[in-house]
Amino acid sequence: MVQIVVRDNNVEQALRALKKKMQREGLFREMKARQHFEKPSEKKARQRAEAVRRARKLARKRAQREGIV
């Protein structure tokens, strides 16, 4: 459970801290995923697509670091 301490009645700062913690813990992603049921086949396809995206991004970064691109 995420807890935030409000100091000096500064609610805006507490909200920013809450959003940052929720983002870091992946709660926004989980809430979005749980809004609708996802069939196992769709889940596998999405995960494969994400893996391909990550691999391409990593390859792009490696190529840029090595000076190929």
Curated annotation (Swiss-Prot):
Signal peptide: none
Membrane spanning residue stretches: none
GO terms under biological process: translation
Entry GO terms, CC: ribonucleoprotein complex; ribosome
Gene3D superfamilies named among the record's database cross-references: Ribosomal protein S8
Pfam families cross-referenced by the UniProt entry: Ribosomal_S21
PROSITE patterns in the cross-refs: RIBOSOMAL_S21
A molecular function (GO) term: structural constituent of ribosome
Keywords: Ribonucleoprotein, Ribosomal protein
Family: Belongs to the bacterial ribosomal protein bS21 family.
Name by which UniProt lists this protein: Small ribosomal subunit protein bS21
